[in-house]
């Protein structure tokens, strides 16, 4: 996401963890080449975890395994430098399935400095346990399959208009302020 933001000529700051290996340094170097501020990326053992997803021919995830990294160093960084990081930012993009304490810290600084928060997820089952966070952010971004998981419904057969009508009711009843659902080649 930080790289995509930089590619449209904005200058994001990326706050994250990477492995303390050559791979972690490669991530930092690539982001820096795209003019992403990498000052707040910390190098820690196993900082990126391990992720594997298996997709079917239609592009849907059919299996996934993961080993989440310990993000306590990120929580510590926010406790130490949160004011410095957030006071002058334009908005905040966060992965909502980070450790609860980390998300709470980010939401605290967002409220303190009146910043909008845009959230995505990589593990919908974790996000499902944190529905209260969805009510505290400004906009939740997910794909059609993730929206179906969130609302315990099947959306794959829906076109954009039907999806919009159906989601409007669900988003309102869930008290989510705003939600963007990507639909692959459908919009």
Residue ranges, per PLM feature:
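Aromatic/hydrophobic pocket-lining residues that form π-stacking "cages" and hydrophobic walls in ligand
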Residues: 27, 105-108
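Short beta->alpha connector loops
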Residues: 20-21, 97-101, 121-126
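Short glycine-rich anion-binding loops that position phosphate/pyrophosphate groups of nucleotides
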Residues: 57-60, 67-70, 97-99, 123, ...
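Glycine- and other small-residue-rich loops at beta-strand/loop junctions that grip anionic moieties
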Residues: 16, 41, 94-96, 119-122
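Histidine-anchored nucleotide/phosphate-binding helix
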Residues: 1-7, 107
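Short acidic active-site motifs
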Residues: 81, 102, 126-130
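Conserved N-terminal subdomain of the carbohydrate kinase-like
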Residues: 7-90
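Conserved phosphate/ATP/ADP-binding segment of small-molecule kinases
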Residues: 107, 111-187
